[in-house]
Every structure is written in structure tokens, then in C-alpha cells.
Amino acid sequence: MNEVSVIKEGWLHKRGEYIKTWRPRYFLLKSDGSFIGYKERPEAPDQTLPPLNNFSVAECQLMKTERPRPNTFVIRCLQWTTVIERTFHVDSPDEREEWMRAIQMVANSLKQRGPGEDAMDYKCGSPSDSSTSEMMEVAVNKARAKVTMNDFDYLKLLGKGTFGKVILVREKATGRYYAMKILRKEVIIAKDEVAHTVTESRVLQNTRHPFLTALKYAFQTHDRLCFVMEYANGGELFFHLSRERVFTEDRARFYGAEIVSALEYLHSRDVVYRDIKLENLMLDKDGHIKITDFGLCKEGISDGATMKTFCGTPEYLAPEVLEDNDYGRAVDWWGLGVVMYEMMCGRLPFYNQDHERLFELILMEEIRFPRTLGPEAKSLLAGLLKKDPKQRLGGGPSDAKEVMEHRFFLSINWQDVVQKKLLPPFKPQVTSEVDTRYFDDEFTAQSITITPPDRYDSLDPLELDQRTHFPQFSYSASIRE
């Protein structure tokens, strides 16, 4: 067991992920890859004071830029299948070089340790991400045959964003249908500024839960990263709610219970999902919930390595996320509160087109309920949408149990939930696996344009050079089935 030591420490200015202000943080970079930020300089490196920022530099990509401030550097990596960034600046070019060299050295040493050694549970991102080792293990495809683009028929476009697209595909060998998320490498790699790139996929290898989308394969082409995931064709919950405007409390209770069951499973494995929102909640063909990771940045990335525009759905952000403080499992209970409020009230709990005003509402505004809402539902939502994560329902040490024991869920048998014994309140009227009536025809009506598959199997040396940014980015579920 290697002893963890502090490699470098000092003051950095960290840019808020959402409220784009710069905050001074005292950071410790440790030999195990952890990169921990405090409001004040800690008296001792091993002190128990909780940090405000806690993530890992293992297998990250480093970039430097002079925007939006001189001497800025960016740490970028994949969180599940979504690109995330953290931005810092220092006072001088020399100081920036020192930090980048130190981070690079730690990342390299972790990479060289090899499987089974200390600190090989590659983690990245925020505090919640940094404990996702079980679901983000290094994936090396030892399957008998390598998966390529040629192995699939491309049927319909399901979604599209700045980073890439999600396509309904059919695996030729088995006839099975999947959703393939295709990310363009050029938006993940800032070509001339890469000091170190993501070198292995962090994938949802070990998820085994009825309400979580499973990953079947991950592979790459010369210019794409591809994730082949379970396909749920009942459509987004967002699609159904926008049609019906509001769900009955019973219907919301059913969906809420399945989401709680999935979150309990993730939290028991020290994984915080972080992104509960209607668009990430799908229905399968029978009407059960499937939490997906199809997230595509809809608002885009402007030019420059660090110019990340607001990407994501700000209406769902918890107060502690906005304040850029360390956050844990309670962030998921806030997300549950927002989606259940939408289901039962027909609108978001906090909304304003102006992001700054919206953030103010999330941080300060008291929650309001329609008169038609029952007392148990009001009590549940008020508990889930408490501003202080420590006071929030589910924010205590018993986590999901607190939520499960709330009187709103009194009629729910949780064993029956996980065993799918409860009858879904709505069964999607799909006629076949390729029936996409519950997907937005803005996408499904479009023709699919991807580079012809044969292009991927005859890479020239220049194209192979780009592949070296993502060595061993491959995975097949069959190796553990």
C-alpha cells in the first residue's frame, strides 16, 4: 500500500462551473490523484475539515489558455460519457507551468502503476464523480472480436447536440437494437493544446439495476468515440409530461419510487448521479423508468479551449452546486425533488430565462405549491427541495431510506419496486423496437449522416496519430456476462 503524500500545494483561482466568478481556493495535489480545494489554508494536510472542491486528476487532459484570464489552465475529462471541465488561473506563467507539470507527473505515475495497484480506480470530476470507481473502471476490451462501426445498421437519429449525436442502431450479428452515442473527438481534444489526453474510457461497466441504462460496448474510430447503450423506446418522461401537462400523484409516485430505487443502488456504490432531470428519464417498452446517460450539450462550446458556454439544464442545479461547494449524495435528492415537482405541478419549481435571476431563485426563493397538491406530496417536495443539503430529505446518513420512509411512499413495497412487480400506470403504445413515436420528430425525421463505415477500417498514419489520444478505449459487456 503506497502512502499518499502531498505533491504540490498552494492558492489557485477556480472558476465556478455555473456562476462564472473566480473563487480563491487553497489546493492540495496528492500522489493518489486527488486534487482538493479549501476556502482557507488547512493547518495540516490530513486535517478532517471538509474541502469545498474534491476531484481527481487521474487520466485527465490538461490545456493552457490566456482566456478568459492570463495564466489560465483547464482540466478536462469524461464524466461517464459526458465531457466536463474545471478552470483555474494563477498569477504567472511560471506558476502555471509548475502546477501543470505536477499534475502531469501525478497523472503519468497513476497511469504507469498498472491494474490492481493502488489508485487505479480512475476517477475524475467533482467530489461526487471522484468516488465512482466501480462504475468507471478502466475498460480494456478483451472480447474475441473488436467492435467497429461496420457491426451496426444505422436506423434513426434520436438526439443531436454539439458533442455529437445519439442514433438508434441494430447490431447485425444479433439483430438487437441499441442507442449509440457518438462523440466527436475534436471537441474533446483541443488539438494543439493537449498536454495529456483522456487515455482510457470511463464507462458504466458494472451497473446491474433494472432502472439504469446498461452500456454494451465502447469503441473508437479515427475521429469518434462510440458508446453503445441499452435502448428504451418508450420515450423521454419529458415528452409524455409535455403532452399531458401534469401527472396524477399516483403516477408520479410510481416513477418517483423507481428513481429512488436506482439512486439507492448508485449511492450504495458511492456513486452520485448528479444529473437527474426529465430528459435523462426514459420509459422502456413496458412503461418502467430507465435513467440514461444520453446527455448531449445542447448549448454548445464556443471557440477556445476554455470557453465553455453554459451547458446543461440550469433549472435542475442544486444550491450547493451553484455555490461551488463540495456536494455529495443530497444533490440527487434535490434533482428528484425538481422532477417530481414538475410531474405533480406541471412546471419547474424555479424558472427564469435569465440565468443569473434563475440562480438567485434557486438559492433564495421559497418553494410554492398549487392548492390542488395533497399534503403528503407537499411535504415530500418541501423536504427534497430544502436549500441546505444537510437539512434535505435524504441528506442524512441513512440517505435513500429517509426518502423511502416518507409518508408519500407509504403504500410502496420497495422489494416489489426493484423486482418490477408494480404495474406501470402507462404502457407506451409501441408496435416494434424501431417505433420511435415517442421521440422528437425534429430528430427522427432527419436523415442520418455519418462517415461511411469503411473509412474507419483503413486509417492512414495521420488518423492513427489521433487515435493515440485514446489508447485502449474499448469495452464489451460480453466479457463479464
From Swiss-Prot:
Activity regulation reads: Two specific sites, one in the kinase domain (Thr-309) and the other in the C-terminal regulatory region (Ser-474), need to be phosphorylated for its full activation. AKT2 phosphorylation of PKP1 is induced by insulin. Inhibited by Akt inhibitor MK2206.
Q: Which InterPro entries match?
A: AGC-kinase_C, Akt2, Kinase-like_dom_sf, PH-like_dom_sf, PH_domain, PH_PKB, Pkinase_C, Prot_kinase_dom
| Positions where N-acetylmethionine occurs in the chain | M1
Which cysteines share a disulfide bond? C60-C77, C297-C311
Q: Where does Mn(2+) bind?
A: N280, D293
Q: Which residues carry this modification: Phosphothreonine?
A: T309, T451
Entry's localization field: Cytoplasm; Nucleus; Cell membrane; Early endosome
List the EC numbers from the record. Answer: 2.7.11.1
The record's comment on protein family reads: Belongs to the protein kinase superfamily. AGC Ser/Thr protein kinase family. RAC subfamily.
Q: What is this protein called?
A: RAC-beta serine/threonine-protein kinase
Organism from which the protein derives: Mus musculus
